[in-house]
């Protein structure tokens, strides 16, 4: 089993199935692997001559497929996700791409079905199954890898969250932008005490418009 590969990133590209591939040259051998789009964006923004990629090898229809991740924790989360019935590699990568490591773990541990369902291809039943099967495992695992979750008092109520997310998504903001706005506003104790969804939406739009 290959734990990681360290070498020179040659290029990233999309294949005919719109999946992002990284070509990593190690000792004059080019390894092709699928990586999350988040990882690809990071590489384009911060180019480097030498790169360490944590890998997972999967054999499908007798064909080996290599997946690459920026961190060992991200790879382990991927492995946990594909262990869930009905969750394949592409859906696992989509979850990581949509929410990112910490937010995805937080959503699973807190049983936040709505957040999990933001991922294309993940419906309510699938989200519920992910939370049900992984909640206990990830509650223990995230402590080992140093992922800290905010206390429930450090986030607005679920009803407010849903209203803010639905409104901002309808206005064209991305999940990433919405989550950043909510996270920033949640640092204000006065806002946390506020249960008025309209005020949360107004403040979020103001922050996003800066």
From Swiss-Prot:
<keyword id="KW-0234">DNA repair</keyword>
<dbReference type="InterPro" id="IPR013849">
    <property type="entry name" value="DNA_helicase_Holl-junc_RuvA_I"/>
</dbReference>
<dbReference type="GO" id="GO:0005524">
    <property type="term" value="F:ATP binding"/>
</dbReference>
<dbReference type="GO" id="GO:0048476">
    <property type="term" value="C:Holliday junction resolvase complex"/>
</dbReference>
<dbReference type="InterPro" id="IPR036267">
    <property type="entry name" value="RuvA_C_sf"/>
</dbReference>
<dbReference type="GO" id="GO:0006281">
    <property type="term" value="P:DNA repair"/>
</dbReference>
<dbReference type="InterPro" id="IPR012340">
    <property type="entry name" value="NA-bd_OB-fold"/>
</dbReference>
<comment type="function">
    <text>The RuvA-RuvB-RuvC complex processes Holliday junction (HJ) DNA during genetic recombination and DNA repair, while the RuvA-RuvB complex plays an important role in the rescue of blocked DNA replication forks via replication fork reversal (RFR). RuvA specifically binds to HJ cruciform DNA, conferring on it an open structure. The RuvB hexamer acts as an ATP-dependent pump, pulling dsDNA into and through the RuvAB complex. HJ branch migration allows RuvC to scan DNA until it finds its consensus sequence, where it cleaves and resolves the cruciform DNA.</text>
</comment>
<comment type="subunit">
    <text>Homotetramer. Forms an RuvA(8)-RuvB(12)-Holliday junction (HJ) complex. HJ DNA is sandwiched between 2 RuvA tetramers; dsDNA enters through RuvA and exits via RuvB. An RuvB hexamer assembles on each DNA strand where it exits the tetramer. Each RuvB hexamer is contacted by two RuvA subunits (via domain III) on 2 adjacent RuvB subunits; this complex drives branch migration. In the full resolvosome a probable DNA-RuvA(4)-RuvB(12)-RuvC(2) complex forms which resolves the HJ.</text>
</comment>
<comment type="similarity">
    <text>Belongs to the RuvA family.</text>
</comment>
<keyword id="KW-0963">Cytoplasm</keyword>
<feature type="region of interest" description="Domain II">
    <location>
        <begin position="71"/>
        <end position="149"/>
    </location>
</feature>
<keyword id="KW-0227">DNA damage</keyword>
<protein>
    <recommendedName>
        <fullName>Holliday junction branch migration complex subunit RuvA</fullName>
    </recommendedName>
</protein>
<dbReference type="GO" id="GO:0005737">
    <property type="term" value="C:cytoplasm"/>
</dbReference>
<dbReference type="Pfam" id="PF14520">
    <property type="entry name" value="HHH_5"/>
</dbReference>
<dbReference type="Pfam" id="PF07499">
    <property type="entry name" value="RuvA_C"/>
</dbReference>
<dbReference type="GO" id="GO:0009379">
    <property type="term" value="C:Holliday junction helicase complex"/>
</dbReference>
<keyword id="KW-0238">DNA-binding</keyword>
<dbReference type="GO" id="GO:0009378">
    <property type="term" value="F:four-way junction helicase activity"/>
</dbReference>
<dbReference type="InterPro" id="IPR011114">
    <property type="entry name" value="RuvA_C"/>
</dbReference>
<feature type="region of interest" description="Flexible linker">
    <location>
        <begin position="150"/>
        <end position="160"/>
    </location>
</feature>
<keyword id="KW-0233">DNA recombination</keyword>
<dbReference type="InterPro" id="IPR000085">
    <property type="entry name" value="RuvA"/>
</dbReference>
<dbReference type="GO" id="GO:0000400">
    <property type="term" value="F:four-way junction DNA binding"/>
</dbReference>
<feature type="region of interest" description="Domain I">
    <location>
        <begin position="1"/>
        <end position="70"/>
    </location>
</feature>
<feature type="region of interest" description="Domain III">
    <location>
        <begin position="160"/>
        <end position="210"/>
    </location>
</feature>
<dbReference type="InterPro" id="IPR010994">
    <property type="entry name" value="RuvA_2-like"/>
</dbReference>
<dbReference type="Pfam" id="PF01330">
    <property type="entry name" value="RuvA_N"/>
</dbReference>
<dbReference type="GO" id="GO:0006310">
    <property type="term" value="P:DNA recombination"/>
</dbReference>
<dbReference type="InterPro" id="IPR003583">
    <property type="entry name" value="Hlx-hairpin-Hlx_DNA-bd_motif"/>
</dbReference>
């Amino acid at each position: 089993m290959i734990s990681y590969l360290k070498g020179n990133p040659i290029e990233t590209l999309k294949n005919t199935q719109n999946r992002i591939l990284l070509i990593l040259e190690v000792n004059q051998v080019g390894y092709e692997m699928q990586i999350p789009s988040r990882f690809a964006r990071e590489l384009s923004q911060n180019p480097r001559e030498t790169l360490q990629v944590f890998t997972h090898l999967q054999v499908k229809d007798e064909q080996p497929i290599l997946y690459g991740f920026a961190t060992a924790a991200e790879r382990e989360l991927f492995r946990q996700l594909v262990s869930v019935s009905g969750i394949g590699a592409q859906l696992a990568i989509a979850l990581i791409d949509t929410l990112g490591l910490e937010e995805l773990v937080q959503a699973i541990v807190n049983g936040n079905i709505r957040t999990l369902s933001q991922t294309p291809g993940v419906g309510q039943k699938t989200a519920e199954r992910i939370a049900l099967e992984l909640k206990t495992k990830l509650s223990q695992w995230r402590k080992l890898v140093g992922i800290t979750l905010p206390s429930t008092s450090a986030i607005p109520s679920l009803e407010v969250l849903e209203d803010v997310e639905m409104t901002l998504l309808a206005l064209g903001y991305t999940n990433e932008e919405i989550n950043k706005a909510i996270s920033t506003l949640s640092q204000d104790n006065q806002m946390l005490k506020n249960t008025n969804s309209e005020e949360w939406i107004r403040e979020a739009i103001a922050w996003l418009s800066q």
